[in-house]
Curated annotation (Swiss-Prot):
One of the primary rRNA binding proteins, it binds directly to 16S rRNA where it nucleates assembly of the head domain of the 30S subunit. Is located at the subunit interface close to the decoding center, probably blocks exit of the E-site tRNA. Belongs to the universal ribosomal protein uS7 family. CDD domains: uS7_Bacteria (cd14869). This is Small ribosomal subunit protein uS7. Part of the 30S ribosomal subunit. Contacts proteins S9 and S11. The keyword Nuclease does not apply. GO terms for molecular function: rRNA binding; structural constituent of ribosome; tRNA binding. One of its GO terms (biological process) is translation.
Length: 156
């Protein structure tokens, strides 16, 4: 990691259908091997399924799902003397978003539905209702941080 300069953050363009920057980041995370049009098809297909099932706009459901998955606190390893402590620290907003997106997609990929579009829509619906593996992952991270609260004075 460079000590002199931190990398410049690139500007992410909003997606063409909804004009949402977070949705573009989500699509970029779904994308494999540079196949953006395939990723767009998967995400937009999932949002259409959500719209059909909930009879409301898919964007609020997506945003609620992401909000329910984003962690506020996590543990980081800190070596003191010979021991390694799991120290709870607050998560920065950019990392919160990145972790939320990553967990949603990995939870969707682990599901049993037939196509990725169906898996993603089901996981987004579950997450927006406070269920699903992505929300469980966040709860586990929060529980871990709570269990290691005694080491919070070792913060950076």
């Amino acid at each position: 990691m460079s000590r002199r300069h931190s990398a410049e953050k690139r500007e992410v363009n909003p997606d063409p259908k909804f004009g949402n920057v977070i949705l573009t980041k989500f699509m970029n995370s779904v994308m494999y091997a540079g196949k953006k049009s395939v990723a767009e098809g998967i995400v937009y297909g999932a949002l259409e399924i959500i719209e059909a099932k909930t009879k409301q706009g898919p964007l609020p459901v997506f945003e609620q799902a992401l909000e329910n998955v984003m962690p506020t606190i996590e543990v980081r390893s800190r070596r003191v003397g010979g021991a390694t402590y799991q120290v709870p620290v607050e998560v920065r907003s950019v990392r919160r978003q990145a972790l939320g997106i990553r967990w949603l997609i990995s939870a969707a990929r682990d599901r049993n539905e037939k196509t990725m579009t169906e898996r993603l829509s089901a996981e987004l619906l579950d997450a927006s209702n406070g269920r699903g593996n992505a929300v469980k992952k966040r709860e586990d991270v929060h529980r871990m941080a709570e269990a290691n609260r005694a080491f919070s004075h070792y913060r950076w």
